[in-house]
UniProtKB/Swiss-Prot annotation:
The keyword Cell cycle does not apply. This is Squamosa promoter-binding-like protein 11. A zinc finger (SBP-type) spans 172-249. A motif (Bipartite nuclear localization signal) lies at residues 232-248. It comes from Arabidopsis thaliana (Mouse-ear cress). One of its GO terms (molecular function) is DNA-binding transcription factor activity. One of its GO terms (biological process) is regulation of timing of transition from vegetative to reproductive phase. Binds 2 Zn(2+) ions per subunit. Zn(2+) 1 binds at residues 175, 180, 197, 200. The keyword Zinc-finger applies. InterPro entries: SBP-like, SBP_dom, SBP_sf. Gene3D superfamilies: Transcription factor, SBP-box domain (4.10.1100.10). The SBP-type zinc finger is required for the binding to DNA. Its cofactor is Zn(2+).
Length: 393
C-alpha cells in the first residue's frame, strides 16, 4: 500500500508490527486485503477499525488499541458532515494468540475550507425537525450587507442623477411671446401644446420674434394682424370657410326627388322662411299653356314655385281665404282644390294636401285648347305637403 502522507495512527500500527519481527513477513503474506475506496477531497489519513476483539496479550497492543479507537472516533465525528471518504478493509486470519481477527482501515480526507464553512452553517441547524436556530452573528452580518447595498443605491447623488435625466428629457413648456416666458406646466393642455399663455392667446396684438402677430383660435397659429377683422379672434380666411359651411342659400326650396310609392308620386317641399309675395291676381304663362288664378280673397294671396323631379316647374297660388286652385294640362298636376288649415291667427304655419279630382279628363278639357280630352297625357295623382312661414303685415 502506497500512501503519500503518514499519520500518527499509521505510525502506531507500523510500530506494533515492528515489535513482533518474527511474524511480520508471515502475517503480511497470510493477510488478504479487501479495499473499499470512496472518492473525497482534502488531506488523507488512515484510521483502523477493529471489527472484533478477543483478547489483548501485550501492553503495547492495548495502548495501540486505545489510541486507534480514540483517534478513529475523533476523525469520524469531525468528518460526519464530509460527504466522501476512502475506506479500506483489511481482513486477516491470524493465529489463536493474536488479539485482532478483523481490522478495518478508513482512509479519511480532512475537510477543506469550503467544507468547514458548510459545517459551520449546518451547526446553526436545530436538532429538532431541522429548524434553523437564530444566530445573531450570522444573520446580523447578512442584514448589514443588504442594508449597505440598499443605502448605496439610494444615495442622494444617484437620485439627483435620475431627476436630472428626467428633467433633460422633459423640457418645461413656456410661452413663446417676447418678454413673457411664463411656465405653462400647470396650464391647460391646449396652451401647453401651442406654447402660448391664456392671456396672450386673446390679445389683439403680440410680439413674436420681433414681429407683430395675433393668435388665431381656429388655426391655433400666429398670423399677421392684417389677416384679422376687428374684434374677431379668428383670421379672415378661416372665418370665410366657417361661414360658408353654415350659411344656406335663401329663396330656394330643397326638394327630394320624386319617388313612386303605392303607384303615387309623393313630393316634399320645405320652405326656408322667405317672405311671401302678396299678389291680388296674376296671369302665368308656361309654354303654350296659360294659368289664370282668381282667388276669392285677394288681400293676402301668395305664390309658391317649385321644381319636380322630372324637370318641369310648377306654381301654386293660394290666398288668405284658405283656398287655392291650380291646373295644368301637360305638367303632371290634376285639376283640383285643397284647403289650408291655419292653426292660429298670424301663426304663419300652414299644411295642406292636394287631392285628386273626381273627373280628371273633364278638368283638363276645360283648361286645354284642344277639344279632344283623350289627346291629353295621362296624369297620376300625387300628394303635396307644404310648410312655410308667412310674414305678417
Amino acid at each position: 500500500m502506497d500512501c503519500n502522507m503518514v499519520s500518527s495512527s499509521q505510525w502506531d500500527w507500523e510500530h506494533l508490527i515492528m515489535s513482533n519481527p518474527s511474524r511480520t513477513e508471515d502475517d503480511s503474506k497470510q493477510l488478504p486485503t479487501e479495499w473499499e475506496i470512496e472518492k473525497g477531497e482534502g488531506i488523507e489519513s488512515i484510521v483502523p477499525h477493529f471489527s472484533g476483539l478477543e483478547r489483548v496479550s501485550s501492553g503495547s497492543a492495548t495502548s495501540f488499541w486505545h489510541t486507534a479507537v480514540s483517534k478513529s472516533s475523533q476523525s469520524t465525528s469531525i468528518n460526519s458532515s464530509s460527504p466522501e471518504a476512502k475506506r479500506c478493509k483489511l481482513a486477516s486470519e491470524s493465529s489463536p494468540g493474536d488479539s485482532c481477527s478483523n481490522i478495518d482501515f478508513v482512509q479519511v480526507k480532512a475537510p477543506t475550507a469550503l467544507e468547514v464553512s458548510v459545517a459551520s452553517a449546518e451547526s446553526d441547524l436545530c436538532l429538532k425537525l431541522g429548524k434553523r436556530t437564530y444566530s445573531e452573528e450570522y444573520w446580523g452580518r447578512n442584514n448589514n450587507e443588504i442594508s449597505a447595498v440598499s443605502m448605496k443605491l439610494l444615495t442622494p447623488s444617484v437620485v439627483a442623477g435620475k431627476s436630472k435625466l428626467c428633467g433633460q428629457s422633459m423640457p418645461v413648456p413656456r410661452c413663446q411671446i417676447d418678454g413673457c416666458e411664463l411656465d405653462l406646466s400647470s396650464a391647460k393642455g391646449y396652451h401647453r401644446k401651442h406654447k402660448v399663455c391664456e392671456k396672450h392667446s386673446k390679445c389683439p396684438k403680440v410680439s413674436v420674434s420681433g414681429l407683430e402677430r395675433r393668435f388665431c383660435q381656429q388655426c391655433s397659429r400666429f398670423h399677421a394682424v392684417s389677416e384679422f377683422d376687428e374684434k374677431k379672434r379668428s383670421c379672415r380666411k378661416r372665418l370665410s370657410h366657417h361661414n360658408a359651411r353654415r350659411r344656406k342659400p335663401q329663396g330656394v326650396f330643397s326638394m327630394n326627388p320624386e319617388r313612386v310609392y303605392d303607384r303615387r308620386q309623393h313630393t316634399n317641399m320645405l320652405w326656408n322662411g322667405v317672405s311671401l309675395n302678396a299678389r291680388s291676381e296674376e296671369m302665368y304663362e308656361w309654354g303654350n299653356n296659360t294659368y289664370d288664378t282668381k282667388p276669392r280673397q285677394t288681400e293676402k294671396s301668395f305664390t309658391l314655385s317649385f321644381q319636380r323631379g322630372n324637370g318641369s316647374e310648377d306654381q301654386l297660388v293660394a290666398s288668405s281665404s284658405r283656398m287655392f286652385s291650380t291646373s295644368q294640362t301637360s305638367g303632371g298636376f290634376p285639376a283640383g282644390k285643397s284647403k289650408f288649415q291655419l292653426h292660429g291667427e298670424d301663426v304663419g304655419e300652414y299644411s295642406g294636401v292636394l287631392h285628386e279630382s273626381q273627373d280628371i279628363h273633364r278638368a283638363l278639357s276645360l283648361l286645354s285648347t284642344s277639344s279632344d280630352p283623350l289627346a291629353q297625357p295621362h296624369v297620376q295623382p300625387f300628394s303635396l305637403l307644404c310648410s312655410y312661414d308667412v310674414v305678417p303685415k
